[in-house]
Amino acid sequence: MKLGYSTWGMPKVPVDEALAHLAGLGFDGVELTVIPGYTTELSKLDAVERSRIRQLLQKHHLMLPAIAAHSSLLSNDKETHAANMARLKGAVDLAVEWAQGDIIPAIDTTPGGKPAEWDAVRDLLVERTRELVEYAQARNVTIAMEPHVGAVIDTPEKVLQLLALVDSPYLKVNFDISHFNIQGLAIEETVAALAPHTVHTHVKDERGLVPDFEFLIPGEGDFDYVTYLKAMQAHGYDGFISVEISIMVQRRPDYDPLAAATLSYETLSRAFIEAGIPRK
């Protein structure tokens, strides 16, 4: 396994500064975020900037396991849905451009919606997910669906049902275990269910249970990263463990995105060592 970091927690940090900082800390890779409001927003990436970022990744010896393009697939507004689908498909095209040899970044997204809507919108979600996956499959790109607390897919069972209904090897899971930890689900339970279907991950720290919970920077809470890493390895996962800093943390008045990355690296790199898992 390798250690990565998502620029989700760095919306206003110039990409040059972000990549230099992450490489300097020792991260093995990065997930670049391309949604509106970020310095790497998809609509702002012209051909010159795309080429420049690819060269920056090479310069800093950073792998690109995933691109964060989180956009709802369940908007009832036709224009909004069209814009969301265009962004996701544009991210697929970007993944092809930013491929590193035969390593093509996955496209991470969340489904949108609310948990109680599952039965009502499942067929629509399958239809729209299938459209996206077919577009991605034609380009050899994998879509990584992320179960998310408060979203229509918020449990392992739901995301596994979606995978079965779409039935494509190009639809896998972006596994953020924090969304299950705050629901009181055990590490072994969720890892056993999802690791075999996972193409990319997110980790963060957390405190409390739904509805009284907060997401934290790795190292601020009590999440047992060593047990988690050992479980992921035991269930056959050998990809990236990527830190994601939540919007909840980013709203802090004293939030420092570079300091958050530093604490995250210290916490996770130590956990890899304590777990006896080499980063390779």
Language-model-detected regions and their locations in the chain:
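Glycine-rich, proline-tolerant flexible connector loops at the mouths of alpha/beta enzymes
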Residues: 33-54, 111-113
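Residue-level marker of alpha-helix boundaries and capping positions
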Residues: 8-9, 44, 82, 122-123, ...
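Conserved long hydrophobic alpha-helices within structured protein cores
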Residues: 22-33, 84, 88-97, 242
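Histidine-acidic metal/acid-base catalytic patches
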Residues: 1-4, 11-28, 51, 58-61, ...
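Active-site acidic/histidine proton-transfer and metal-coordination neighborhood
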Residues: 17, 51, 55-63, 73-173, ...
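A short acidic, helix-capping loop that chelates divalent metal ions and anchors anionic groups
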Residues: 36-41, 73-78, 113-118, 182-184, ...
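Active-site beta-loop-alpha junctions enriched in small/polar residues
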Residues: 6-10, 33-35, 69-72, 110-114, ...
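Short, well-structured secondary-structure segments
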Residues: 30-34, 63-68, 105-108
